[in-house]
Structures are given as structure tokens and as C-alpha cells.
Amino acid sequence: VVGLVIGGYFAWYVYTAMYQPNIWTANGKPISFYVYPNESYASVETKLYQKGLIINRKKFEWLSEKMKYPENVKVGHYRIPNGMNNNDLINMLRSGSQAPVNVIFNNTRTIEDFAVRISEQLLLDTASLLKVLSNSAFLEPMGFTPDNVKIMFIPNTYEFYWTVSAEAFVKRMNHEYKRFWTDDKKQLA
């Protein structure tokens, strides 16, 4: 009988550690949470606690260890909803299941201003983006040069993963440029 009680308690503990809602957000809405390069599990854990997101720290820490999250911290931008359970949170963070960010740009006068504006919204830095935007060999197959590359960027709101590379960002913007400037639009212009 004692064994059944102990076994039942353990099963209840595991179940609640995994599936009981353990995330609380102040306004009840999802929050953005960023994990930076070279950030440790301890740092991620501290940020979650400082934001007041984790209701039961012991169960979060126990399950994190069991699911090997400390060895699998992934960089990214995550959307954490109110009422999420530990299992879903840890799976999202350790698998790198990012939520896209909205990247908005308009009224940038120079390519340098543009690169600064983009690096304020994504993980990539201004220097790496400027390096790609000045690389003739990279731009030429797309039909651009460092002198005319600014016309590729059509002001709008775009969704990107926060960790996108400078090269992937420019390739995506080239795709958006081609999608916008159809043959019909080119003839009208």
C-alpha cells in the first residue's frame, strides 16, 4: 500500500511538472522572449524568473534537467503564451521553434541607415549586413550592384526569423522585389 501511495505521488508529480500550466504573463498575452548566442541555461532560467513567468520553479528546473534542456539551449525569438505548461515551453526552447518577428523599414536615406534599422530588429549586426550589401559577387546574380542595391528593398512589413543571416535576408528581399515588380508592373513604370 505504501508503495502504491509513493508511486501515485511520483506519477502525480511528473504529470503536474509536465502538463500543469506553469507560465504566467502579467496581461495574459503572449510575451516575446529572446535567447542570445552563447547564452547558458542558467542565464535563460534567470531571465524567465526575472520576468516572473515561471510559477513553480522547482518543477521547471526538475523537468528541464530530465529533458536535457541545459545541454540544448537554442538561440532565437520565442512567443511564450500565458498558461503554457513546462513540457511545451522546454520543447519549444530546446528545439529552437522560433516565432517570426515583424521587420519594418521605410524612409531610410542611405544603405547604412537601412542596415542599422534592420540590425535593430534582427540578431544580425550592421557590419555583416553592409558586408553582404557591398559584395558585388553576391549581388550580381540577382541583378544588383552595391551602387543600386537599395532599390531592392521595398518599404513594408516582413516576417523573418530573428536569427536570419545577412545573406538569407538579402536573398529573401530579392525574392520580395521580384514578386512585387512583375513584368506588367515594369511595363507600367
Residue ranges and their predicted role:
Residues V1-A189:
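Conserved catalytic or metal-liganding residues and their short signature motifs at active sites
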